[in-house]
Amino acid sequence: MITKSNLKNTLKSAGFSDTSKDKYEKNYPLSDCSIIVDFKNEKIIYPEDKGFKVNVATTTNFSEPENFVVLECVNRLLDKGYRPENIELERTWTLGHEQKSGRADICVSNQNGKMLFIIECKTFGVEYNKEMKNILSDGGQLISYWQQERGCRWLVLYASNINSSNDIEYTTDSIDCSDDENILNLARKDATILLYKDAHTASELYDAWKETYEQRFSGDIIFRDDSIAYDIGVKPLRKKDLKDFSENDKIVNRFEEILRHNNVSDKENAFNRLIAL
């Protein structure tokens, strides 16, 4: 976990320099901005003069270890080429019938101001795993935010850590918020298929993700080496990314139903027939 006690080592590993007494700074040439971390006043100074938006000041202090994860993630975004005017911390929405407030850690928009992805930051290990379980159970915080920002393209869960060698490590996963074109085609023949575009509540979005997309994750689509800022997406599959289908996968059952419905019994030609359908 990144804490106050190891924050200086984390900043050094991230490319920050000790510019003066108890201040660390990093400049980002791609966007002509900088971040300053003031240890004396326990303050993280983001480039608000360059359009970076901070909605809640508590995310810029040293009070919670999660703030350091947000800092490390923002550093990674700026290194990747995202511009400060497209990054926003702690965007707030009113969620659900109880009018509870929900705040997204990091929102990133495209050059036209449309929401590109929402990042929920957690401390490494227990809290990250806990939120992943929440997402699998009921959609967690991220799908609630998605309901408020239906134009969002991706949902991202993120955590980072500094290890015993003072190397920064991170873990992340993502959900594609777009209906798959193949699924849309199947839905034209099967009205029971749940689609994101037809969902009106967070629970309906979760149901579509669970039932139709089988709680599919897309991995590290933001920070992996071949990902380009503002042009993210699922890259060509690499061998290490492949996962075997199991007989219990619902998508396999769905294919079998379509084959039976169309009287396709020739297993040798089933794939070609399925594509043709």
Language-model segments: residues:
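Conserved catalytic cores of phosphodiester-cleaving nucleases, focusing on short active-site segments
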Residues: C73, A104-N110, M115-Y128, Y145
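Interdomain/boundary linker segments immediately adjacent to catalytic/signaling cores
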Residues: M1-E64
